[in-house]
Amino acid sequence: KGKPWPKQEESPTSKAPTESPWLSKTAVLANTWPGSEDSLIFLWENRRKPNEIFDNKAQTPRYCNGRLRGLAKFDRYHAMDLTGGTFEVQGIDQMLLEACLRTNQLALEAVVTTETISPELTCPIITFSSEQGSGNFTLVQKGDNLVFHLRTAKTDADGTKPETTLYRIDAGQPNHIVVAYHPGRLVCYVNGKRVFSTVDMVGNFSNWSAQRLLFGGEWGGKQDWAGQLEGIAIYNRFLSPEEAKHNYAHYAKRLKARQPVARFVVRARLREKTQMPTIAKLQEYARALVVHTYDVQNALKGDPDSGRILVAHWVFLDRQPVLSIDEKRVGQLYRLELERFDDNPQLESEMQFNDCQEFDLPFFYDVSPNQKTEGQKSATKL
């Protein structure tokens, strides 16, 4: 079974009067996610989906695209895995700004899974900013809390005063988050239930300025968030409780249907290396895998059922060489965390280099942590 959805409890301080009737009016909801494309400005479900919004004015679809940066990659469910990197959205910034200025309303929806909880941690997850201290809105992980900064005519330059703490999160647990605002009301729904609501947030967006939409970090910031994002939708309208519940219910079905995959940890001796490709061989690709042959010495977790295996490693990420792979030497022992290659369908469309003579061996994918690109060393030798 997939990961369970955590229970939510609304804190006493988050209680507020029931939404006014006009706020509870729900758009006609289709039997899917999202339930309505009314006032939908940005949509990114996962890499396999078209991520398109039909433009009624132009009578054509508009596609929401972006680029992985740093060590970011896609996971087996085609979600953004932003550990060590970011997802840079393309062609949406001015449209998002103008849309929100027209309505002075905003709704941010996403499925968020954090990998790390630490009291010292402060990492932006979703930002519409251009530098630290000047964002229009920011969803932040601060310790084990989700925090929201919203810039209005009644707040400071980046919406951090007042800072709004929305919800406490747990590592490894997917949460469907909706944060919705109109002047005089800020509300947060987690997994279809209201967990925070306040009437103290006021002001329009007249002080908003041109910014950049980024996932996994903040423009000009040094801290990268570690976790996965998917099911992202941004609207220039307030979302009703009914719509938040509807969207959660439909996305939850997809996540609950997912099955965990086997993870292996082995000590293995590098037997044969594929020659390191040059960046010129990537052509238009930003990422590439290289395949090596290993002789398994010890199985520390799980049993790969073979004494000799093929392992695919990232050799380029964001067109930068992964030095931990280039540093590997034939005859050396390495500790590897692995998954079966076939359990990672997101790799099918990635460029792959393989010179290994024994091409029919069991095939695995290296998921070892702490991979670094050029200028940083991370090969783990035993």
Which residues does each predicted region cover?
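Extracytoplasmic low-complexity segments
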Residues: 1-87, 93-99, 129-131, 245-257
